[in-house]
Design a protein with these regions (language model features):
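Cys-based phosphatases of the PTP/DUSP/CDC25 superfamily and their flanking regulatory architecture
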Residues: 1-379
Length: 379
């Protein structure tokens, strides 16, 4: 079904088609990967002045709560394209040179799409296996506690006469930074200020998940703890902003697990018809809203494995039966018949995503391991 959607989207000449893709060069150059785009009719629109490009590679994802009928909301995105310093706008760490990409656009989205409190879940390192996976878009520590959002005339909030700092629209400031051992996550409490308004943003960086893979061992339980922890800082109707590198593989897997575990906790998954497959249904619904969500079979299998394990625990918690007993095994298999056979989901290799060609110099590493650009004055 995904191949059919992508083929239809590529061939569609009508932007009203549900899976149409925009061909504008300004849109294409804002994608980190050539083959991962947001559908034209299911994407976040930046609030910019009329005539300016409002594209950001971010898709609103809504999955229905089967009990209440209300939508669980997320935003799947990617951060920081491999652009040079002359491309539109960027963030400046205090006393540091500019970093790569449309980072101010990302923070604008966080500001406008979040409610009173923003929640960001980051499932990638900035560098993995020697490759840049994500731009450094947030303050790392107290030595670089603030990042400036540079003003641009395309901003709807831009008011040159009201600027207290020339050329500065806002800033991201680190208030607290901790490491949660249970969820194996770096947790940062940030203040995002744009214009005269500000809000708190919680940022979770999970380090236990390499690209194209699945968490193993204790990292698996840590991911489940992160799902609960990030949910506790938000509400179902306040979209958690989730990203990895491309915003489809690890991102889609996280969102699917969050939704399905909520469905399990409510009891809905324990009352399904034997032929029902909630994992397939959820992934298919996500792929209708953003291409390639849950990128490979290994990640698909991982969702089945986790849901099977958590269903076992749920049944044990409810009935008090022994999971290792023969009767317990029969009851378990009857309840989760569609979740208990990984044979159809053996991992197979898929090609790596193709990055947009770098239009700037190859970045060097800073003290923190994040990329730096040469001084533009010397170019």
């Amino acid at each position: 079904m995904q191949r059919t959607r992508l083929a239809e989207g590529n061939l569609a000449n009508d932007l009203l088609h549900p899976w149409a893709l925009e061909a504008d060069p300004k849109v294409k150059e804002r994608n980190r990967y050539i083959n991962v785009q947001a559908f034209a009719n299911c994407r976040i629109h930046l609030r910019v002045a009329e005539g300016e490009c409002d594209f950001i590679n971010a898709s609103p994802i809504t999955l229905e709560d089967s009990v209440t009928g209300e939508g669980r909301k997320y935003i799947a995105t990617q951060v920081g394209c491999a652009f040079g310093i002359n491309h539109m706008r960027f963030c400046l760490p205090i006393n540091q040179g500019p970093k790569l990409g449309h980072l101010a656009d990302f923070w604008h989205m966080v500001f406008h799409e979040s409610k009173e409190v923003g929640v960001i879940v980051m499932l990638t390192q900035t560098f993995e296996a020697g490759r840049e996976k994500c731009a450094q878009y947030f303050p790392l520590d107290t030595e670089q506690a603030s990042m400036v959002l540079l003003a641009d005339e395309s901003d709807v909030l831009f008011d040159e006469s009201g600027q207290t700092e020339p050329g500065v629209l806002g800033r991201v400031t680190l208030l607290e930074s901790t490491f949660d051992a249970k969820s194996r996550s770096e947790i940062r409490k940030l203040e995002l200020a744009i214009g005269s308004e500000s809000k708190i943003v919680w940022h979770f960086l999970f380090a236990g998940w390499a690209d194209y893979s699945k968490p193993e061992g204790s990292d698996r339980q840590a991911l489940l703890d992160l799902i609960k922890l990030s949910a506790s800082k938000s509400s179902p109707d306040n979209p958690r902003i989730v990203h990895c590198s491309a915003g489809v593989g690890r991102t889609g897997t996280f969102i699917a697990l969050d939704h399905l575990l909520c469905e399990l906790e409510s009891g809905h998954l324990l009352n399904l018809e034997p032929e029902a497959d909630p994992v397939f249904k959820t992934v298919d619904q996500m792929r209708e809203q953003r291409m390639m969500m849950v990128y490979n079979e290994m990640q698909m299998q991982f969702i089945y494995e986790v849901l099977r394990e958590q269903t076992d625990r749920k049944l044990g918690k409810i009935t008090g039966w022994n999971m290792d007993s023969p009767n317990g095994s029969e009851e378990r298999s009857a309840k989760i018949a569609k979740l208990n056979d990984p044979a159809d989901y053996l991992p197979t290799s898929k090609p790596e995503l193709e990055a947009v060609p770098d239009r700037s110099h190859t970045p060097t590493r800073s003290r923190s391991g994040t990329p730096e650009l040469p001084d533009p004055v010397n170019e």
